[in-house]
Amino acid sequence: AGLGSSNLYIWSYEISYYQYLYPYNNYHILLDNFKYFKEFGGNYIYPEGTWENMNNPGFAKLRDYINSKGMFDVNSDYNELVDKFFKYYFREAAPVMRKYFNEVQVNLTINENITGGRVHSYGLSDNRVWPEALVTGWLNSFDVAQNEILKYKDTDSELYEALSKHILIESLFPRYVLCTKYDKSFSASQIKEMRKSFLKDFEDLGN
């Protein structure tokens, strides 16, 4: 059943606009949304995500990829798209980055009673959702990921730079949490350097 229109224009919201650098756990429902919109006469959709930042963390690029496929085929398989994205976007670093992504998803799922599902909510940044030990542990994942792609540094510098950039983008989120939520765990000089490094990477990535 439809709404009697075959030319429905839709503007959807896809991230937490109060917590812009945090992952928003809607990856798995994007395709379902497209199916729903199509059923009710959707003809055009503008999925508003991180449009202000070129390279936002929280797997925004995965969301963009799923959207790009779902707009042309609402019956695309979510798991296949995720597998393909990680395979080609991270290459040899895919296993460790997929593990990190899965852990983020699980963590958000078990804490939905705290975060809620609204795009305008401060609950997503609640310290109970992101314990310091968990966030700190994730930083090692990016070091491992960078080591996995080192072989391209001398054989294919262009590919190496692209893959290294992809990993760096995702490292922004846990670094941001440590810089803003757990600054008291570091000395004044340490947190100053951490924030300086974060800001440089954030801006160098075109954000």
Give residue spans per PLM region.
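Structured mid-domain segments that build the active-site/substrate or prosthetic-cofactor binding neighborhood
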Residues: 1-95, 99, 106
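Catalytic domains of carbohydrate-active enzymes that cleave complex glycans
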Residues: 40-42, 67-207
